[in-house]
Amino acid sequence: MNTYEEMNNVLKNQKEFFIKNGAPSIDLRIDRLQRLKSLIMDNRYDFVDALNADFGNRSKNASMLSDVYGIMPAINLAIKNVKKWNKIEKKSSNFPFGILGAKSYIKYEPLGTVGMISPWNFPVNLAFVPLVSIFAAGNQAVSYTHLRA
């Protein structure tokens, strides 16, 4: 199976899963964010070692700071605010509907599966930071790190 077929298969499975199960709850979104944080922290030394092996001349401290610890503020912010970000927003209804008793609101809904292509110059950071927003919004992701970007 080639990369195109593999990605199509993953996309098909994720779409079917989302249609079957619907939008994830806020608690599940927070759980995904916490698991993402744990995954990054549990593997931070492996990430840094792999980056050093790939780039050869990058400081391990710089990689740890930019590629690993640079992700944590985004995750912490999302965990703290995901409930607020997903609240229904009441809006005023336009004339003449407002005077007729109409109610207007904005309800944010996930798209389902989101495609994400990340470049390779800061591979850990640029692959994981977008996942924070994707998971907080209740979406799933098909991620591809482009080797020539």
Locations of regions flagged by a protein language model:
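Conserved small/polar residues in nucleotide/adenosyl-binding loops
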Residues: T145-A149
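N-terminal Rossmann-like NAD(P)+-binding subdomain of aldehyde/semialdehyde dehydrogenases
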Residues: M1-K103
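Phosphate-coordination loops involved in phosphoryl transfer and adenosine-cofactor binding
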Residues: L111
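Conserved coil-to-alpha-helix start sites within the AMP-binding
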Residues: P119-F128
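A short hydrophobic/small-residue beta-strand
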Residues: Q140-A141
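Short hydrophobic alpha-helices that are characteristic scaffold elements of the AMP-binding
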Residues: F135-A136
